[in-house]
């Protein structure tokens, strides 16, 4: 699970995150990288999952990548944050039969959106408080 995350995170985190975050900010960078990340996995997912599951997982990838970008930016800009996050995703999916075939990716996306919006809210609130 960890070894599989290494080459991807060298691309997503080490190569793309910094320039795209500087150019577009963390949310737009998350949409761009997360969208590409989702499309990157469509073919292997299509071997065992229906279209609705795949669409939900692509949305989930955008949300997770955005959270990963915030973790990267506020976690010391370390590749390790992306590797740990990606490994946790791989392990979580791997414990389910057929790589998560029994989970509802749309419900997971809603929960991830709530978590992400909370994270952004607290970061912005903390940022405003530290300026005072």
Annotate the PLM regions.
Residues 1-23, 46-53, 57, 98:
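Juxtamembrane helix-loop-helix connectors linking adjacent transmembrane helices
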Residues 7-33, 70-78:
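Membrane-interface helix/loop boundary segments of multi-pass membrane proteins
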Residues 27-49:
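Membrane-helix boundary elements
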Residues 41, 45, 65, 90-94, ...:
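Hydrophobic transmembrane alpha-helices of multi-pass small-molecule transporters
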Residues 54-109:
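Functionally important transmembrane alpha-helices
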Residues 108-126:
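Hydrophobic core of alpha-helical transmembrane segments in multi-pass integral membrane proteins
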Residues 128-132:
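Short, Lys/Arg-enriched, Gly/Pro-containing loop segments at transmembrane-helix junctions
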